[in-house]
UniProtKB/Swiss-Prot annotation:
Gene3D superfamilies listed in its UniProt record: 1.10.8.60, ClpX chaperone, C4-type zinc finger domain (6.20.220.10), P-loop containing nucleotide triphosphate hydrolases (3.40.50.300)
Subunit structure: Component of the ClpX-ClpP complex. Forms a hexameric ring that, in the presence of ATP, binds to fourteen ClpP subunits assembled into a disk-like structure with a central cavity, resembling the structure of eukaryotic proteasomes.
Family stated for the protein in its record: Belongs to the ClpX chaperone family.
Binding annotation for ATP: P136, T137, G138, T139, G140, K141, T142, L143
One example of a Gene Ontology biological process annotation: cell division
Pfam families assigned to the protein according to its UniProt record, in alphabetical order: AAA_2, ClpB_D2-small, zf-C4_ClpX
Domain ClpX-type ZB: 9-62
Species name: Chlorobium phaeobacteroides (strain DSM 266 / SMG 266 / 2430)
Annotated protein name in UniProt: ATP-dependent Clp protease ATP-binding subunit ClpX
NCBIfam families: clpX (TIGR00382), PRK05342.1 (NF003745)
HAMAP family: ClpX
Gene (name only): clpX
GO molecular function, one term: ATP-dependent protein folding chaperone
Classification via InterPro entries: AAA+_ATPase (IPR003593), ATP-dep_Clp_protease_ClpX (IPR050052), ATPase_AAA_core (IPR003959), Clp_ATPase_C (IPR019489), Clp_protease_ATP-bd_su_ClpX (IPR004487), ClpX_bact (IPR046425), P-loop_NTPase (IPR027417), Znf_CppX_C4 (IPR010603)
Length: 436
């Protein structure tokens, strides 16, 4: 005999109507909360039970969902040497920056692990090692941060500092950054609180001078002040749907104590500040090492101090929250050529894979690769120019490729890169084909 479902309402001893859970029959006095639906109610206990049942079923079907629910501190701690080797598979050069990042990240997650068992009030408190990366556009700052997050299997998000403003002004507030990290972790709060946030263009929020201004600077010093709270570690109420469009929503509290922040920027002109300071004791220092394409002095940037950053426009409190400072070198012709072909996800390898899916072998002549590098250097945007140069050339070829009959090989020449001339096509027997 089928059991009758419990109704959503019942009668008390004195005849008054009361709310009952439609699943377990408990009254509002027996539970913490009751959620109402069309002609039905469900209590918080039944919601929790239902969630556990669904979680187990989903985990059995989808292993990645189970992994997402597991605590991230169980992830194997990777040594600095192993981190640096892994970074080297994707990032060409920048050995000093890779070593600094490897040590800082290793210490950061070692610090988190130690917090799980260190309860003695006399224990030494290890502070968080947020990182500041200084280097020209297109030198790999974002790629380094992204690769680290992938290697460690932690949530990752990128924020543009230029879009941030103080709360109450048009633009994104700093809580938006944490909301994006929450999305990246599929709303897994524990994974969110151990993720990595990369804040790009951090130099753009420097105030115009080191002197205190009486005018309101909502996208400069004001943003630095707002970022202090989440950089140093605090519990922040984050609106999951975005703060300003949905002010009525319930906040999710995120503790930023164990979130690693990596800030990056070009800091154009910083080398001149350093040179001016250094030249007082060493005349002509660094004058022979300027990069001819970027104007950057890579050697002198390594001597950057907190005072230099303060003079540039970062407030002392903000600088203090970024104890690890590393610089990246401008990319020369050799480095750009290596970036094209050597990393695991090199752009040339990606194009070859795409052509392979169409049954066509793709080849670039050495002269073609040199021409790509020359054009990229002229544009002055580092490695990111490589893709844009190639994309502008390859788009027409990839548009026609699926409909070309009998083509088994495509050779990109220097003339193809420079003048958009037709590449060399070959049939399966090695004969050159002319495509009308």
């Amino acid at each position: 005999m089928t059991k009758e479902p419990v109704k959503g309402k019942g009668k008390t001893g004195n005849g008054n109507e009361q709310v009952l859970c439609s699943f377990c029959g408990r009254t509002t006095h027996e539970v913490n909360s009751m959620v109402a639906g069309p002609n039905a109610f469900i209590c918080d206990r039944c919601i929790k039970t239902s969630y556990e049942i669904l979680r187990k079923e989903i985990s059995a079907i989808n292993p990645s969902a189970k992994r997402a629910q597991e605590s991230t501190f169980q992830t194997r701690l990777i040594s600095p040497k192993a981190i640096m080797e892994s970074l080297g598979q994707y990032v060409v050069g920048q050995e000093i920056a890779k070593k600094s990042l490897a040590v800082a990240v290793y210490n950061h997650y070692k610090r988190i692990d130690s917090q799980e068992w260190a309860h003695d009030s006399d224990e030494v408190v290890i502070e968080k090692s947020n990182i500041l990366l200084i280097g020209p556009t297109g030198t790999g700052k974002t790629l380094l941060a992204q690769t680290l997050a992938n290697l460690l299997d932690v949530p990752f998000t990128i924020a543009d500092a230029t879009s941030l403003t103080e709360a109450g002004y048009v633009g994104d507030d700093v809580e938006t950054i944490l909301a994006r990290l929450l999305y990246a972790s599929d709303f897994n709060l524990e994974r969110t609180e151990r993720g990595i946030i990369y804040v790009d263009e951090i130099d753009k929020i420097a105030r115009k001078s080191a002197n205190v201004s009486i005018t309101r600077d909502v996208s400069g010093e004001g943003v630095q002040q707002a970022l202090l709270k989440i950089l140093e570690g605090s519990v922040v109420g984050v609106p999951p749907k975005g703060g300003r469009k949905h002010p009525e929503q319930q906040l999710i509290n995120i503790n930023t104590r164990n979130i690693l922040f990596i800030c990056g920027g070009a800091f154009e002109g910083l080398d001149k500040l350093i040179a001016r300071r250094v030249s007082k004791s060493s005349m002509g220092f660094g004058s022979k090492v300027k990069n001819k394409h970027t104007g950057y002095d890579p050697e002198i940037l390594r001597f950057v101090t907190q005072d230099d950053l303060h003079e540039y426009g970062l407030i002392p409190e903000f600088i203090g929250r970024l104890p690890v400072i590393s610089t990246l070198d401008p990319l020369d012709e050799t480095a750009l050529r290596s970036i094209l072909v050597e990393p695991k996800n090199a752009i040339i390898k990606q194009y070859k894979k795409l052509f392979e899916m169409d049954g066509v072998e793709l080849e670039f002549t050495d002269e073609a690769l040199d021409k790509v590098v020359d054009i990229a250097i002229d544009r002055g945007t580092g490695a990111r120019a490589l893709r844009s140069v190639l994309e502008s050339v390859m788009i027409d070829i990839m548009f026609e490729l699926p409909t070309l009959k009998g083509v088994k090989k495509c050779v990109i020449t220097a003339d193809t890169i420079e003048n958009r001339s037709e590449p060399e096509f070959y049939s399966g027997d090695g004969k050159k084909k002319k495509i009308a």
